[in-house]
């Protein structure tokens, strides 16, 4: 996972911890917790099943030189990622997916708006963070076990 994505997910995890303490009865139905659940489903199941699926294509929205970028759409959120299906490592062919960025509630999808996730992400790409090179994305990525973080919340704040 790219640090840009990790930062957004960590913020959501912190909010989930607060909700677990302050609103335990509403925890499962809280919009932030539902958003976190959707992200978990996307990165652990839906996207890895077939990252090349046409539903993840974004066309020329970011410009023709950024067509390799994929995105998952859910509500007014966009999760941007890149994948490569033929990376060789130790004579084994690997499929690598790098989850790069997710907009927050300050930049919900609204076509034409300067804070629209596509507009924000395009500016980020032009500024070089995240990098356009897949190799650089992989180098910048960090190991982040989201499931471990969720288990920590459950242990810290049992029902």
Feature-to-residue mapping (PLM):
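Basic, Lys/Arg-enriched alpha-helical interface segments
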Residues: 1-76, 84-159
